[in-house]
A protein has these predicted regions:
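Cationic, histidine-enriched alpha-helical/coil surfaces that engage anionic ligands
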Residues: 1-186
């Protein structure tokens, strides 16, 4: 039909985009073994987000079998978001440890009549405690994210999703150059 002819290139482009997001997500997976790689952890979260949102848009075409993939992506995205929050906390607390920052706080406390000797030591102790708490949380979340990726999400993304995309492409009535490339990849 005329409508199918119009939609085919759009669907093929969407399938290529999804594959690109899958490739991007899997490329960041090794960073889950590297605790000191917050920029790639954040990039992996964003890649999961792009893939999830694209799949949500295409859910009517992919059908209910895409639900487990969407659920796994949402859970992973949440874990990675919590990990990112810990990493931001640690960066902010490190900046707060800076002597200039502490001196400024001390001055403001003196102006407020709160004194500074006990306050400075208390603040440093509180910062130290928060840093340790966030480091422990970061380590736990990174371990959980690594486990989740290897035990659940990797399978969903690389096998189930790839299969769903292939099945959807096969339902297209007319073969095209883009569709043949996509099928050859699978």
């Amino acid at each position: 039909s005329q409508q199918e002819l119009v939609l085919l290139p759009l669907w093929e482009e969407a399938a290529e985009k999804i594959q690109m997001y899958i490739d991007e997500l899997t490329a960041y997976a090794p960073s889950l073994q590297q605790p000191q790689d917050p920029s790639n952890h954040h990039a992996m979260r964003i890649a999961a987000k792009k893939l999830r949102y694209s799949l949500e848009i295409l859910e009517p075409l992919l059908g209910s079998p895409v639900q487990p993939v969407l659920q796994a992506l949402e859970e992973f995205q949440s874990l990675m978001g919590q990990l990112h929050d810990c990493q931001v906390w640690l960066m902010e607390l490190e900046a707060l440890q800076d002597r200039k920052q502490l001196q400024e706080i001390r001055k403001q406390w003196q102006k407020a009549g709160l004194g500074c000797g006990w306050a400075s030591k208390s603040l440093q102790a509180a910062i130290g405690w928060l840093q340790e708490d966030r480091r422990l949380a970061q380590a736990k979340l990174l371990e959980e994210a690594g486990w989740f990726w290897h035990e659940r999400l990797e399978e969903e993304v690389t096998n189930r999703l790839a299969s769903l995309i292939q099945k959807a492409l096969l339902r297209c009535p007319w073969p095209s150059e883009g569709r043949q490339r996509q099928l050859a990849r699978g």
